[in-house]
């Protein structure tokens, strides 16, 4: 009886113990994050392609909301903060208004937002990609310009979402190389 109990304990412990080559889910997702990034960016681009024409047709303004200074912040020491703030800006200010522009695009804007939330979650789990504290002046400029545009700001911000994806890609490519 004693040996069968010992055998059961050993079997149980062996099943619970992780294999030596495997880390936690968070560690594994961080290990695979650079390889998964192209797929996440593709998913963002695919989701955006479903609403791009709608918002770009309604965007009648010639100026850019997402300027080169934002890309420079993404590439500089404020890259982490600029990325975190811009994701938050799109999720909390832009997307909720964009969903209300037309019932036919609501589901697609929602899907785009879910893809952006997934990216943010993965970035947060992998601290080396999003370890930040400081505020970005370029993001403040984007937010101020967006607010000044009032109802036209939503069309401007959504019509330039592809630029935002490109900036995310530039930031992540830089971080992966480092």
UniProtKB/Swiss-Prot annotation:
Annotated GO biological process: immune response; interleukin-10-mediated signaling pathway; negative regulation of B cell proliferation; negative regulation of cytokine production involved in immune response; negative regulation of inflammatory response; negative regulation of interleukin-6 production; negative regulation of membrane protein ectodomain proteolysis; positive regulation of B cell apoptotic process
Assigned keywords, A-Z: Cytokine, Disulfide bond, Glycoprotein, Secreted, Signal
GO cellular component terms given for this protein: extracellular space
Alphabetized GO MF terms: cytokine activity
Chief subcellular location: secreted
Disulfide bonds: 30-126, 80-132
Subcellular location: Secreted
Signal peptide: 1-18
Glycosylation sites: 134
Record InterPro entries: 4_helix_cytokine-like_core, IL-10, IL-10/19/20/24/26, IL-10_CS
Job of this protein: Major immune regulatory cytokine that acts on many cells of the immune system where it has profound anti-inflammatory functions, limiting excessive tissue disruption caused by inflammation. Mechanistically, IL10 binds to its heterotetrameric receptor comprising IL10RA and IL10RB leading to JAK1 and STAT2-mediated phosphorylation of STAT3. In turn, STAT3 translocates to the nucleus where it drives expression of anti-inflammatory mediators.
Quaternary data: Homodimer. Interacts with IL10RA and IL10RB.
Family: Belongs to the IL-10 family.
Protein name, as recorded: Interleukin-10
Organism: Pan troglodytes
Gene that this polypeptide is encoded by: IL10
């Amino acid at each position: 009886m004693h040996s069968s109990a010992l055998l059961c304990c050993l079997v149980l412990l062996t099943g619970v113990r992780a294999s030596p080559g495997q880390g936690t889910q968070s560690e594994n997702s961080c290990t695979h994050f650079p390889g998964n990034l192209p797929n996440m960016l593709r998913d963002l681009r695919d989701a955006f392609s479903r609403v791009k024409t709608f918002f770009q047709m309604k965007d009648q303004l010639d100026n850019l909301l997402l300027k080169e200074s934002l890309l420079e912040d993404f590439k500089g020491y404020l890259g982490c903060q600029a990325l975190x703030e811009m994701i938050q800006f799109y999720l909390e200010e832009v997307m909720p208004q964009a969903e209300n522009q037309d019932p036919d695009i609501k589901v697609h804007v929602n899907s785009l937002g879910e893809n952006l939330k997934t990216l943010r979650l993965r970035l947060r789990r992998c601290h080396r990609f999003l370890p930040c504290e400081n505020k970005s002046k370029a993001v403040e400029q984007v937010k101020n310009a967006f607010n000044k545009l009032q109802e036209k700001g939503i069309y401007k911000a959504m019509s330039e979402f592809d630029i935002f994806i490109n900036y995310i890609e530039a930031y992540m490519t830089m971080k992966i190389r480092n």
